[in-house]
């Protein structure tokens, strides 16, 4: 037998390049693309507040819908799909669907990411991961073993990506966190590169993709670009091949593709998020119209935000 068929032989784990001191020059065309995407996100954010009003009680439910849309899309990237009914039951702890429970855990991860966005340190990322894999042995813990992506679960030989050795993970994460603390890059560029580096490090035994995408939202919020969740993962989901190819290119030293993918996904998220806001506002208007003539203190009015 060959070494590959036996799953034995030499392999090379990734040693990620340090980011904290690297200078990233964003070419003019890409800078314009990113600026356009960021403008779209800001416009969506403003539209949500204007359409419903910054203090409108429906903005809370709308934020929840957007957050769940992002969480479900991020989970779907990992082949975890679930219907709305099962997701609702899982949130009430009444679903037997493992996928539904996983998506609810992703919602909790996103909630933690947004709650901790102002101070993204290692503890914050471990907390996000602990929410995602709650109840498992590895929840909220950096891995202590080698992990890889693709081919066989038994051996790293022939894998698409072999993550850094476990002993190199703490230092790689500290470098990433120092990079995240910088303030000299466009937010979307910053988040895209941080995400790709996180996926390169693969700091956990499981849940790296979902935690890494939650990290993106923590940065978009913490750095002041967004106050409402835009379903960026829904945009990534429309072209998974390009997303995974961009991550591979980043590991090879080319950051441009992953920045381009996040710019594209951000524009999609802005359009999708705006549509969701408009749909909710329209539905509320229709429901109020149906209640015309019903006295203001009737129980039916309490159902509407």
Question: How would you name each of these model-derived features?
Answer:
Residues 1-305:
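FIC/Doc superfamily catalytic core
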């Amino acid at each position: 037998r060959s070494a590959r068929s036996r799953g034995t032989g030499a392999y090379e784990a990734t040693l990620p390049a340090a980011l904290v001191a690297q200078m990233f020059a964003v070419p003019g065309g890409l800078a314009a693309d990113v600026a356009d995407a960021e403008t779209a996100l800001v416009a969506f954010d403003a539209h949500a507040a204007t359409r419903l009003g910054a203090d409108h009680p429906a903005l809370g439910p709308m934020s929840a819908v957007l957050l769940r849309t992002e969480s479900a899309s991020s989970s779907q990237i990992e082949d975890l799909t679930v219907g709305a009914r099962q997701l609702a039951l899982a949130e009430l702890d009444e679903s037997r669907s493992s996928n539904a429970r996983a998506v609810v855990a992703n919602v909790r991860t996103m909630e933690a990411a947004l709650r901790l966005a102002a101070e993204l340190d290692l503890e914050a990322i471990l907390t996000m991961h602990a929410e995602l894999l709650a109840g498992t042995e590895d929840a909220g813990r950096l891995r202590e073993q080698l992990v890889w992506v693709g081919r066989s679960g038994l051996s790293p030989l022939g894998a698409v990506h072999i993550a850094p050795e476990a002993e190199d993970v703490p230092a790689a994460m500290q470098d990433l966190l120092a990079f995240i603390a910088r303030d000299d890059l466009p937010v979307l560029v910053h988040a895209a590169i941080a995400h790709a580096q996180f996926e390169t490090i693969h700091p956990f035994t499981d849940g790296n993709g979902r935690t890494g995408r939650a990290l993106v939202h923590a940065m978009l919020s913490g750095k002041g670009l967004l106050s409402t969740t835009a379903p960026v993962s829904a945009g990534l989901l429309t072209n998974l091949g390009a997303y995974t190819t961009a991550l591979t290119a980043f590991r090879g030293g080319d950051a441009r593709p992953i920045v381009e993918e996040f710019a594209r996904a951000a524009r999609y998220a802005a359009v999708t998020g705006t549509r969701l806001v408009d749909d909710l506002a329209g539905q509320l208007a229709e429901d109020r119209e149906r209640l015309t003539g019903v006295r203001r203190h009737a129980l039916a009015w309490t159902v509407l935000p």
